[in-house]
């Protein structure tokens, strides 16, 4: 009986190490290679621009991505604060270990990739040098009953694209016109400095925290996807057209397009309040989505080309 328990513990330890190593490599890969949908959208936008300057800027972005892969380095020097959105089944065997192993994976990736040191302890104001600290990496949880799968969304929240983020609660009389005004105000004021073209995540709910979380989850959706609600999907298109009309262009240098798209995520609200929030991803929108089964077999649907290299 004791031997069986020891074997089980060793098996668990090996599985934890394997998942840690996979996630460390996936974090590093996400830092270096942009998602397939982002690359495709940037190419589409480049082809639709009609001035030499805008085309040169887009070509520089593609050259940057080419060099990131060739030199095995991050596609942007600001590798952000690591954030994970975990949708985990209650029967996934490593659910109890996930938060700790994700932290260890970030530490490994910081050295191996390498990642810039971006975790500063607030009030004490020192950089930990490991990209981990109090509450970082951030892990948001969705628990899925009776499932043995685990989905992990990886996101690198850079400083520039984080700055436009904001949330507020509107009076119900302000309606969706108020939501539109709030979003456009943030984009006209701060979008220029967030390294456009941007992916804009809009969250609608009751309070600032529900709206803010919705807006972050919106950034995890594929470029070009639409809200399931027809009215919300229509608003996504209207906001996209409105922000494009500002004419930010690539890197804020002017052009026909300011955004790769607008994604809205919403939850039911209190009758007396409309919570709204904005989160923004820059042109180097580094998000990754990996799905594990109970045996740690995995699929990646955001990127082509990721392969786990098992250590000897």
List where the protein language model places each region:
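Non-transmembrane, aqueous-exposed alpha-helical and coiled segments at domain scale
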Residues: 2-312
């Amino acid at each position: 009986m004791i031997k069986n328990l020891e074997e089980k513990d060793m098996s668990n330890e090996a599985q934890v190490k394997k998942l840690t190593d996979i996630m460390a490599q996936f974090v590093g890969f996400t830092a270096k290679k942009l998602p397939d949908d982002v690359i495709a959208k940037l190419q589409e936008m480049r082809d639709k621009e009609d001035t030499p300057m805008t085309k040169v800027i887009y070509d520089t972005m593609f050259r940057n991505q080419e060099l990131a892969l060739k030199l095995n380095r991050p596609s942007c020097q600001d590798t952000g604060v690591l954030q994970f959105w975990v949708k985990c089944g209650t029967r996934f065997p490593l659910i109890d270990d996930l938060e700790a192993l994700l932290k260890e994976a970030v530490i490994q990736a910081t050295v191996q990739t390498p990642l810039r040191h971006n975790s500063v302890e607030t009030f004490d104001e020192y950089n930990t040098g490991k990209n981990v600290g109090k509450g970082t990496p951030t892990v948001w949880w969705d628990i899925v009953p009776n499932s043995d799968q685990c989905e992990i969304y990886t996101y690198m929240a850079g400083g520039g694209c984080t700055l436009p983020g904001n949330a507020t609660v509107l009076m119900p009389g302000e309606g969706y016109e108020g939501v539109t005004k709030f979003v456009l105000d943030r984009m006209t004021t701060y979008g220029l400095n967030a390294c456009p073209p941007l992916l804009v995540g809009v969250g609608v709910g009751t309070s600032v925290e529900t709206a803010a979380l919705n807006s972050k989850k919106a950034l995890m959706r594929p470029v070009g996807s639409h809200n399931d609600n027809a009215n919300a999907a229509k608003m996504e298109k209207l906001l996209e057209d409105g922000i494009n009309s500002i004419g930010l262009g690539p890197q804020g240098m002017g052009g026909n397009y300011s955004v790769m798209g607008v994604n809205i995520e919403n939850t039911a609200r209190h009758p007396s309040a409309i919570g709204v929030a904005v989160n923004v991803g820059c042109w180097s929108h580094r998000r990754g989505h990996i799905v594990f089964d109970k045996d740690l077999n995995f699929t990646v649907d955001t990127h082509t080309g990721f392969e786990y290299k098992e250590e000897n």
